Structures are given as structure tokens and as C-alpha cells.
Amino acid sequence: MKNNHPKKIFWLASYPKSGNTWIRAILSSIFFTPDGIFNFKLLKNITAFDSGINYEFLKTININDFKNLNKINIISQYWIEAQNRIKIDGDFVIYKTHSMNANIYHNDLQKNFQYTDKNITLAYIYIVRDPRDVVISYSNLKSGVVE
């Protein structure tokens, strides 16, 4: 499928509990307000790419694959196509992801599948947080104790 909006995706990538929401708040204030004042409703402008909504087209192509998007060997076959099908209102869209930009090789298909490529990606921010802080943040989320 031809990409009508080359270089249209701005990626916000991170390991879970690394400050993704905080960066989304900053980006939302910059890109989605006229005055830079943050409002929590703005966070809806930056959603997770790997949510099912970006793969709705699969319902008419292959319903079994749509039902199994939680499997890496299924979803990886459709990453690029899903990105090419994205409809945007402005110049770009921002998506958050916890996925890595890597090739996934399928033995059964004898083929590599890439998460994204330079023809689709406008920019990216990769958030890196001290792993010790990630563990504490995750423990707080789960109301547990880190020893």
C-alpha cells in the first residue's frame, strides 16, 4: 500500500514505567495547545500505536489474525501496513510504544518484519530511565515492596 503521508509518525518509545506519561504531557502542551498550558484531556492525543484500533482493517482481511494480535508472529506481519493506513488530520501523529524498532524473523514465512521504517518515521524520542527507578515505580504501581 502506498504511503500518502511520508514521514508522518513521531514515536515516543520507552520501557514501561520510564516516564512516558510525563513526556506525553510535555509534548501535548507543546503541540496541542495554543498557549502551552497542560490539561489532562490532551493526553488522548498521544495513544498507544499497538492498540487494536490501528489494526481494524484486518477484520475484513483476516479475522483470525485480528483475534490474535497479542502474538508477535501475527502482529509483526502488519506493523508497516497499519502505519501506512493511518489517517492524520495535521502534519504528523504522535504514538507511544513499548516495542523496539527491530526486525522479527519468521521461520515459517522465511521473512523479516520490521516495526517501522525511515519512510514512515518523522522523529522519535526514546526515554531511558535508571532501571532502579523503574523497579521502584513499578513496585509502587503494584502496591508492593522492593527489597
Question: Where does each model-flagged region fall?
Answer:
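PAPS-dependent sulfotransferase catalytic domain
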Residues: 1-147
